[in-house]
Amino acid sequence: MIDNDIANQVPKEFSVSEISNKIKELIENNFGHIKVKGEISGLKISSSGHAYFNLKENTAILACTCWRPILVKIKFPLNDGMEVVIGGKLSSYSGNSRYQLSVDNLQPAGLGAMIQILNERKIRLEKEGLFNKKRIPIPFLPDKIGVITSITGAVIKDIIHRIRERCPTRIIIWQVSVQGENSSHEMAEAIEGFNNLEEIHKPSVIIVARGGGSIEDLWSFNDEILVRAAYNSKIPIISAVGHEADYTLIDLAVDKRAPTPTAAAEFAVPVRSILNNTIQSYEKILLNNTNRLIKYHEQSIVNYDKIHRYFAYYINNRQQLLDETGFNLLDVLIRCIALKETKLKSFAKERINYAKIINYKILELTHQTAYLLKSVNNTLKNFEYKLELNSTLLASLDYHNVLKRGFAIVTGDAGNFLSSKSTATNEQSLNIKFFDGEINVVLSSHDLNARSS
C-alpha cells in the first residue's frame, strides 16, 4: 500500500522535445490573436527588412518579430522608447526555450506619440503641396451625391434624413469601415471608385463622413493613402469627420470641410423651400423682364413703322426729282448735240485752210533742218582741226621725245632733280634716266675735281 502511494507521487518523466512541444501547444492553443501594450526597446532591422525588438513594461520583457510584409504597412517610423499596442500571435521555439510575439499590426499607444507622428506627417505632406490644391467648387444642385461611410450607426441616417428634408436627390452609398486597420484603404478605394465610374453614374459631389471619437478612433482619416486619394479626386469632396473640434489630415486635402455629417449634407444641397422661393422670385423677375422687353419691342415696331412711312415718302420725292432731272438732262443733251453738229460743219469748211497752213509749216521746217545740219558739220570740222593742232603741240612737249635727242634726267638719292653740277655732292648716288632705260652711279671727289678743272 505504501509502495503504491510512493509510485503515485513520482512525477511523470518527459523528454526535452516532449516538454518543449507541450509548452508550445499550451501557449499557442491558449493564446490566440492577442494585443499587448508596451514600450519598444532594442530595435533592430535586418538587411532583409524584418524588425526584431522587445516590448517591455517595468522589468517584464516580451520578444517581438515584425516580418517585412507587415513592417512596410506601418505608416510611421519605429523608435526605441515608443509606446505601442501590438496585435499578433504568441509562438514558442523549442530550439532555445523562448517564446515571442509575431506582429500582425502595430499602432502608437500614447497620445503624445500619435500627435508627434501626426505633426511629422502633416509637415511632410504639406511640403509636397497636398494641402494647397485648387479647390473644386461644390455644385449648387447636385443630381447625385456619393457618401463614403459605414452603413451602421447614426451618421448615414443623419445624412440621408437631412438631404431628403432639404432637397431630395439621388444618394449613392459606398460602404466602408471607418475605423480599424484596413479602413483607410477602403475609403481611398471608394474615392477612386467613384472617380472611375462612367460619367452617367458618377456623383456630382462626395461626402466622406464618420461620427466623433478619440484620436485613435479617427486615426484612419490621417492616413497618407486616404489624403492622397482625396487630393487626386476630380470630384469635389466634403469631409465630415467627428465633431467641429476634431481635425484630421483629410480635412486639409478636400475641397470643403464640414464640422459634422449633418452640416455636410447641408453644404451638399440647398433647402427645398428656399430653393422654391428663389425659383418663384426668379420667375417673377423673368416675367417682368419679359413683359418689359415685349413692350419695348412693340414700341420699337411702331417706331420702325413711322420710319418706314417717312422713308417711303422721302424715296417717292427723290424719285420724282430724279425723273424731272432726267427730262431736263435729255433736253440739254439734245441742244448740246445740235450745237456740236453746227460747230462740226463750220470746222469742215475751215479744214482746207488748215491744210495749207500745215504744208507751209512743213516746207519751212525742211529749210531750217537743212541749215541746222550744215551749221553742225562746219562746227565739227572746226573742232577736229583744233584738236589736231593741240595733239601736235602736246607731242612736242613730251619729255620722252627730248630724251631721244640725247638728253638725260639726273636725280639724287631723294628723287630730286639735279640741273647743275653745284648741286651734286661727294659719294652721292645718282640715277640717270635715258629714253631707253636708266643707270645708277656714285660720284667721287675725283669726278668732281675733274669736272671743276
Swiss-Prot record:
<dbReference type="Pfam" id="PF13742">
    <property type="entry name" value="tRNA_anti_2"/>
</dbReference>
<comment type="similarity">
    <text>Belongs to the XseA family.</text>
</comment>
<keyword id="KW-0540">Nuclease</keyword>
<keyword id="KW-0378">Hydrolase</keyword>
<keyword id="KW-0269">Exonuclease</keyword>
<dbReference type="GO" id="GO:0003676">
    <property type="term" value="F:nucleic acid binding"/>
</dbReference>
<comment type="function">
    <text>Bidirectionally degrades single-stranded DNA into large acid-insoluble oligonucleotides, which are then degraded further into small acid-soluble oligonucleotides.</text>
</comment>
<dbReference type="InterPro" id="IPR020579">
    <property type="entry name" value="Exonuc_VII_lsu_C"/>
</dbReference>
<dbReference type="Pfam" id="PF02601">
    <property type="entry name" value="Exonuc_VII_L"/>
</dbReference>
<dbReference type="InterPro" id="IPR003753">
    <property type="entry name" value="Exonuc_VII_L"/>
</dbReference>
<dbReference type="GO" id="GO:0009318">
    <property type="term" value="C:exodeoxyribonuclease VII complex"/>
</dbReference>
<protein>
    <recommendedName>
        <fullName>Exodeoxyribonuclease 7 large subunit</fullName>
        <ecNumber>3.1.11.6</ecNumber>
    </recommendedName>
</protein>
<keyword id="KW-0963">Cytoplasm</keyword>
<dbReference type="GO" id="GO:0005737">
    <property type="term" value="C:cytoplasm"/>
</dbReference>
<comment type="subunit">
    <text>Heterooligomer composed of large and small subunits.</text>
</comment>
<dbReference type="InterPro" id="IPR025824">
    <property type="entry name" value="OB-fold_nuc-bd_dom"/>
</dbReference>
<dbReference type="GO" id="GO:0008855">
    <property type="term" value="F:exodeoxyribonuclease VII activity"/>
</dbReference>
<dbReference type="GO" id="GO:0006308">
    <property type="term" value="P:DNA catabolic process"/>
</dbReference>
